[in-house]
Curated annotation (Swiss-Prot):
Keywords: ATP-binding, Chloroplast, Ligase, Nucleotide-binding, Plastid, tRNA processing. It comes from Chlorella vulgaris (Green alga). The keyword Ligase applies. The gene is tilS. This is tRNA(Ile)-lysidine synthase, chloroplastic. It is found in: Plastid, Chloroplast. Its EC number is 6.3.4.19.
Length: 504
């Protein structure tokens, strides 16, 4: 009994952590990715629980009772007792009644064609979704997925495409604390930056654009209607038009009673009379580089679609989830790909992490995640400071443009004063001729009367000064945020780090 109570309490903790996330209730319709393993199956059962608690609990109770009687075994009935244990918890019911409820849940499964057992997994998921009456999407890979990175990129593209088609913004994955630790170790061994090494990473939703042409073709040439990244021919076209316009003069009374903000409009009439004057006006305009064909073109590059990933099991270990699966006898499918040492992720999972646990610490995952949390805080602080410097740079550039365009007599130029102890940067107006020169870059002289095309030189000089004041760990991220063409600059990062003594 004690074991059952502890497992039910952990199950309730899982459900409370997922209920408190506001993303579930901001988006009524969720998309859950299922692979047949223990992590995805546990997250699926919790989402099914919330779905039926929000709709009607009596229907699922009758279905489960009939299923348990037909099976005549206590073990199969035991796997569905989590629904009743969760319903008895008052905190969950209070949170569900207050917030917006979950209305619909969809499943998606990606077939990689790595093992023959994946086809049995498809059959298992079909039975599971048929029993709970949940929509199910089955995605096949066109290309051969040799490496794990290519498979991960393919899954991201398929998820983003499904979310765009169904007009959703949230996908649920069964990622645990152990998965985040393994992912961070793999990124660390690849030599990643602190941005990708941190816990919070934005999902990439870029997909290849597709061109859809709604025309009738023969079956032999039907494949030409759907082509990826099709380039259209663009030419200059002149469109001429002509129309008849009738005019009527306004009377004095209308002018007197008219409001000051009245919009003048031309009067039109289908009748011919003395009051109206029929005139023909013709005109033409030039369309610069327009499309030659005006068929329906839909591109995914112009639309911005934000994707949010919901992870209800991210605060739990894989060991606790395996205990939960064994106690409730959840149906699973074992994939042999997770045990092959051809993939680097499996080497870290089965060799590297157990070896570190045996030698040093049993709580290696929690300690690593705490370190990642501190790295994430430092990275956010650096990004906020870079945004502040970007605002200062934009303020200096806009103020310079105002002085350059709106001064009637003389154009003034902002000179950067260096040599102060506090390294303060502020704009000053000088009447004397000053210039800014750097030996390693070779920037030309910037005088008092500077032209419009010399504004990028000023911006580059300001960025170089900011990078010389900052520490070495923040210079590279600042250059990426401020300079749009930082890859086209002739100098490298080491030369920029040595620019502290190069200012005059």
């Amino acid at each position: 009994m004690k074991k059952d109570s502890t497992i039910i309490s952990t199950c309730n903790e899982f459900s409370l952590s997922s209920v408190k996330t506001k993303r579930v209730y901001k988006n009524n319709h969720l998309l859950c990715s299922v692979s047949g393993g223990q992590d995805s199956i546990v997250s699926f059962f919790f989402l099914v629980n919330f779905l039926y608690l929000s709709k009607n609990f009596k229907l699922i109770k009758s279905k489960l009772s009939s299923f348990s009687v037909a099976s005549k075994s206590a073990e199969k009935k035991r796997c569905f007792d989590c629904f009743f244990s969760l319903k008895k918890n008052k905190k969950i019911n209070a949170l569900i009644n207050k917030e917006k409820k979950l209305s619909r849940l969809d499943l998606v499964f990606c077939q990689h064609f790595w093992q023959t057992q994946n086809f049995f997994c498809v059959e298992f998921l079909f039975q599971l979704t048929f029993f709970f009456d949940i929509p199910y999407t089955f995605v096949l890979s066109k290309n051969i997925l040799v490496s794990e990175n290519r498979a991960r990129g393919w899954r991201k593209k398929t998820f983003s495409r499904l979310l765009k088609i169904q007009k959703l913004s949230t996908i649920v994955t069964g990622q645990t604390k152990t998965d985040t630790a393994e992912k961070s170790i793999t990124n660390l061994l690849r030599g990643t930056s602190p941005k990708s090494f941190s816990l919070i990473t934005k999902a990439n939703s870029k997909t290849t654009s597709s061109f859809f042409c709604f025309r009738l073709f023969r079956p032999k040439t039907f494949y030409l209607t759907l082509t990826g990244n099709k380039r259209e021919r663009k030419v200059n076209r002149r469109i001429s038009f002509s129309f008849y316009r009738t005019q009527k003069k306004d009377s004095k009374k209308l002018r007197e009673t008219r409001a000051p903000f009245f919009i003048e409009m031309a009067s039109f009439s289908a009748f011919f009379g003395n009051t109206f004057q029929k005139k023909k006006s013709s005109n033409s305009f030039l369309l610069y580089k327009t499309r030659l064909s005006f068929s329906f073109c839909f591109s995914g590059e112009t639309r911005e679609h934000s994707i949010n990933s919901l992870k209800p099991l991210q605060n739990r270990n894989r060991y606790h989830i395996s205990k939960l699966v064994k106690f409730y006898k959840f149906p699973l499918t074992i994939d042999a790909t997770n045990f092959s040492l051809n993939f680097s992720r499996n080497k870290i999972r089965h060799l590297f992490i157990p070896f570190i646990r045996f030698l040093f610490k049993l709580k290696f995952e929690t300690l690593l995640l705490n370190f990642l949390y501190l790295v994430n805080l430092e990275h956010e602080q650096i990004e906020n400071e870079n945004l502040e410097l970007k605002r200062v740079l934009n303020f200096l550039r806009i103020n310079y443009l105002k002085k350059n365009f709106f001064s009637s007599n003389r154009r003034s130029f902002f000179v950067i004063q260096t040599g102060h102890k506090n390294n303060n940067v502020f704009p000053t107006k000088k009447k004397e001729k000053r210039w800014f020169y750097c030996n390693e870059i070779g920037i030309s002289k910037i005088r008092k009367q500077c032209k419009i095309h010399e504004d990028p030189i000023l911006e580059t000089s300001l960025v170089i000064y900011f990078t010389s004041v900052l520490t070495t760990s923040r210079k590279y991220s600042l250059l990426q945020n401020l300079l749009y063409n930082y890859r086209e600059i002739e100098i490298n990062f080491r030369q920029i780090s040595k620019l502290e003594n190069s200012f005059w």
